[in-house]
């Protein structure tokens, strides 16, 4: 049996120290967190990747506008033949896994920069295709394959760069891009590049083609690629 006096002593709550500071209720953080999308746009690497993505996409969609018209006028091809020639431009895309291995090994900067450089000579040489002959058809197909290869190289490196940018930002400021790390938003920025290219590219390329032909369009696109190599070399994968 426990006496009432002893039980009262055990049940009595412990005394608090009057001198100990009372914890204050936590105050909400008055500083507003910057949205992850704005944090991404502050990165020079992302801007360089976005520009390279936009230029490469512009090159590709420019052929969507002009190539069918060109082969119809120069080679008197049907719509079916005009569609088939796009295989030359798109077949190098199937090398994507191999190009991805190269990007993982040597870095996105080199694979992207080399890809953009690869597109320049065949774009300039498009002016050599100017009449109907088998040799001219073979030449056009060869030039398109090289352009497609360069575009596949550039895009493979640039797509890898988007995720690496997120990793780099998170390594410096953990949690700044949110729980998911900002990957989806960075890929969304890539989609913006393609949307702008799809909007601007056909308008500009169609205007140039109508005024001066495919050769001049190739020159304009090659200059655009040459300018793009500079930010790619200086900012991608840095």
Enumerate the language-model features and the residues they cover.
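Juxtamembrane intracellular "pre-TM" segments in multi-pass secondary transporters
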Residues: 5-50
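Helix-to-loop junctions at the C-terminal end of transmembrane segments
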Residues: 95-108, 126, 209
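C-terminal ends and interior cores of transmembrane alpha-helices
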Residues: 113, 117-135, 233
